[in-house]
A protein has these predicted regions:
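Conserved N-terminal entry element of GNAT/NAT acetyltransferase domains
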Residues: 1-9, 144-164
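Short, well-ordered alpha-helical scaffold segments within catalytic/effector domains
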Residues: 23-27, 82-85, 167
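Acyl-donor binding region in acyl/amide transferases
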Residues: 40, 48-54, 59-135
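Compact beta-rich and alpha/beta scaffold cores in large eukaryotic transport/transcription complexes
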Residues: 95-96, 105-108, 157-162, 167-183
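Extended low-complexity acidic/polar segments
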Residues: 123-155
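Extended, low-complexity, amphipathic alpha-helical coiled-coil/linker regions that act as scaffolds
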Residues: 77-78, 130-142, 171, 177, ...
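Generic hydrophobic, helix-prone segments enriched in Leu/Val/Ile
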Residues: 1-6, 116-125, 142, 174
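A conserved beta-strand-loop-helix scaffold within acyl/acetyltransferase catalytic domains
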Residues: 2-73, 171, 175-186
Length: 186
């Protein structure tokens, strides 16, 4: 699977450099998520004759929210990405109806300049046409190490748990700006 991530460009040099610092931790995490029966992860691998052509995974990131991540496919195998997404759709369609699935929301982070996820997820949101059923929000992201981030904050900045009042303010602000589902999914 690691070779597949490199072959598809899912793990690109800058991402690998960032991950390499914690290589042993990443390896243990992947062994646990892919090798053990866990209630917080699911993965789908499309392969033929032992060769991986497509992959997608889900991780339960919040109490009743699952995140689709690590979607990748080899371009030489036509429609491998669609095959994996179709299977993931079938899985979530069946699975979310079970109370034990803890699946009220599905989220996915993707860069809008990536054509495939933008067409799949963006088109779904457009076709649904209701922010209270399916929403897309633009966020920024960056790589950082938690220890570096926390240790280098200067006054008056601090990183603390949000208060009830702050969460209410976030909800009100988000509702005005987006009207989507993100805060509910948290």
């Amino acid at each position: 699977l690691w070779n597949f991530f490199f072959e598809t460009g899912f793990v690109y040099p800058k991402k690998y450099d960032f991950m390499a610092r914690e290589r042993a931790s990443y390896r243990r995490l992947y062994e646990k998520l892919y090798g053990e029966n866990t209630h917080i992860s699911r993965h789908i691998i499309y392969q033929e004759n032992g060769k991986v052509y497509g992959h997608a995974a889900m991780l339960r990131t919040y109490e009743k929210t699952w995140m689709i991540h690590h979607h990748a496919a080899i371009s030489q195998k036509k429609k491998a990405g669609l095959v994996v997404m179709d299977q993931l759709g079938r899985h979530t369609g069946d699975y979310h109806t079970l109370e034990s699935s803890m699946m009220d929301y599905i989220i996915c982070y993707f860069r809008p300049e990536n054509r495939f996820p933008n067409r799949v997820f963006g088109d779904v949101a457009k076709n649904v046409g209701n922010q209270k059923q399916c929403s897309i929000d633009t966020f920024a992201y960056f790589h950082t190490e938690r220890k570096v981030l926390v240790d280098n904050l200067v006054s008056p900045w601090s990183l603390e748990l949000a208060t009830f009042t702050e969460l209410a303010e976030l909800k009100d602000y988000y509702e005005q700006k987006s009207g989507g589902l993100f805060v509910q999914a948290l």
